[in-house]
C-alpha cells in the first residue's frame, strides 16, 4: 500500500450507505476517495461521486467495472450484498487490494471465502463498524462471564423496513460474544423464533427477537434477566454516518498490513482491555 493517503473505492456508491461512505472518505485526513462503483446499467454511472453524495465535485466518476478502477484504489469498502461482495473479494485477492467488509448475511461458505482470502490480503470484516457497538460487545463479554451462567439471556434488535437479513449481523455478533465468554458455540444454544406452545424457557439458551419497521437505523439490546433484577445493555444508532466513519477509519488502519483477517475490535485495540 502507498505511504501517502490511502485511496479507497466505495461499492454501491449510489445507495444510502454508499453515499455516506463517500462523505466519510472525503472528510477523514489521510484518506483519499479513489473510485466509486455501481452496478452495470445504473442511471448513476458517469456521475461525480462527490456530487452524488452531496459533498461537492471530486472528479471521481461512478464506474461499473472493477478493471477500470483497479489502479485507482488501495482498499475496497463494501457494504452491499453477499454475492456481490464475494465477487469483489475475488478481484481484490487477485490484485492485492485490502478490503473493509460491512456486508452482512453471509452463509458459512461465504465466511470461509473471506477467511481464505485473508491469507493473501488484509481484510477488516465486522458486523458493525460503530465504535459504540464494539465497546458494547466487549461489555457483553464481561457481563456474560459474571452473570451468564444463571440469567436468561435475550437479544432484541430493530432495523428499518428495507433490511433483508435477520437477525442482524450485529445481533449475531452479540450472541457470539456472549456464547464465547460462556465457552459455548452459538449454534448450539441460539433460539431464533418462538411460536405456539413452546413450553418453558430452556436454561442456557440465548434468545433472539427481531423488529423491522419504518426508518430505524439500528437498535440492539442484550438482556440478562434473573428473578428480581435484570441488566440491559443497549446501543442505538441515529445515523449511518457512525458506521461509515468506522469503516473509513478501518481502511486507514489497514495501511501497511499485507494480509490477515481483522475486525473492528482490532482497529480500536479493544482486545487488550
Curated annotation (Swiss-Prot):
Pfam families: DapB_C, DapB_N. GO terms for molecular function: 4-hydroxy-tetrahydrodipicolinate reductase; NAD binding; NADP binding; oxidoreductase activity, acting on CH or CH2 groups, NAD or NADP as acceptor. Gene3D superfamilies: Dihydrodipicolinate Reductase, domain 2, NAD(P)-binding Rossmann-like Domain. It catalyses: (S)-2,3,4,5-tetrahydrodipicolinate + NAD(+) + H2O = (2S,4S)-4-hydroxy-2,3,4,5-tetrahydrodipicolinate + NADH + H(+); (S)-2,3,4,5-tetrahydrodipicolinate + NADP(+) + H2O = (2S,4S)-4-hydroxy-2,3,4,5-tetrahydrodipicolinate + NADPH + H(+). Pathway: Amino-acid biosynthesis; L-lysine biosynthesis via DAP pathway; (S)-tetrahydrodipicolinate from L-aspartate: step 4/4. It is found in: Cytoplasm. CDD domains: DHDPR_N. NADP(+) binds at residue 39. NAD(+) binds at residues 12-17, 38, 102-104, 126-129. One of its GO terms (biological process) is lysine biosynthetic process via diaminopimelate. It is an enzyme of class 1 (oxidoreductase). InterPro entries: DapB_C, DapB_N, DapB_N_CS, DHDPR_bac, NAD(P)-bd_dom_sf. Its EC number is 1.17.1.8. The active site is at residues 159, 163. SUPFAM superfamilies: Glyceraldehyde-3-phosphate dehydrogenase-like, C-terminal domain (SSF55347), NAD(P)-binding Rossmann-fold domains (SSF51735). The keyword Zinc does not apply. Homotetramer. HAMAP family: DapB. Catalyzes the conversion of 4-hydroxy-tetrahydrodipicolinate (HTPA) to tetrahydrodipicolinate. NCBIfam families: dapB (TIGR00036). PANTHER family: 4-HYDROXY-TETRAHYDRODIPICOLINATE REDUCTASE 1, CHLOROPLASTIC-RELATED (PTHR20836:SF0), DIHYDRODIPICOLINATE REDUCTASE (PTHR20836). Belongs to the DapB family. This is 4-hydroxy-tetrahydrodipicolinate reductase. It comes from Escherichia coli O1:K1 / APEC.
Amino acid at each position: 500500500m502507498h505511504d501517502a493517503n490511502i485511496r479507497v473505492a466505495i461499492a454501491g456508491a449510489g445507495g444510502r450507505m454508499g453515499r455516506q461512505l463517500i462523505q466519510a472518505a472525503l472528510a477523514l485526513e489521510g484518506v483519499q476517495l479513489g473510485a466509486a462503483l455501481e452496478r452495470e446499467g445504473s442511471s448513476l454511472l458517469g456521475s461525480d461521486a462527490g456530487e452524488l453524495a452531496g459533498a461537492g465535485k471530486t472528479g471521481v466518476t461512478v464506474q461499473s467495472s472493477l478493471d477500470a478502477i483497479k489502479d485507482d484504489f488501495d482498499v475496497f469498502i463494501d457494504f452491499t450484498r453477499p454475492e456481490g461482495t464475494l465477487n469483489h473479494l475475488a478481484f481484490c485477492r487477485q490484485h492485492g487490494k485490502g478490503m473493509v467488509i460491512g456486508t452482512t448475511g453471509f452463509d458459512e461458505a461465504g465466511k470461509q471465502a473471506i477467511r481464505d482470502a485473508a491469507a493473501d490480503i488484509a481484510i477488516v470484516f465486522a458486523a458493525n463498524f460503530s465504535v459504540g457497538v464494539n465497546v458494547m460487545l466487549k461489555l457483553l463479554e464481561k457481563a456474560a462471564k459474571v452473570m451468564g451462567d444463571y440469567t436468561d439471556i435475550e437479544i432484541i434488535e430493530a432495523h428499518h423496513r428495507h433490511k433483508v437479513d435477520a437477525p442482524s449481523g450485529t445481533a449475531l455478533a452479540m450472541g457470539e460474544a456472549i456464547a464465547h465468554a460462556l465457552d459455548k458455540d452459538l449454534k448450539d444454544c441460539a433460539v431464533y423464533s418462538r411460536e405456539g406452545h413452546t413450553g418453558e424457557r430452556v436454561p442456557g439458551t440465548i434468545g433472539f427477537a427481531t423488529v423491522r419497521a419504518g426508518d430505524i437505523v439500528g437498535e440492539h439490546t442484550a438482556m440478562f434477566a434473573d428473578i428480581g433484577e435484570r441488566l440491559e445493555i443497549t446501543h442505538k444508532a441515529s445515523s449511518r454516518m457512525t458506521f461509515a466513519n468506522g469503516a473509513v477509519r478501518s481502511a486507514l488502519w489497514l495501511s501497511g498490513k499485507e494480509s490477515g483477517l481483522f475486525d473492528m475490535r482490532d482497529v480500536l485495540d479493544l482486545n487488550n482491555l
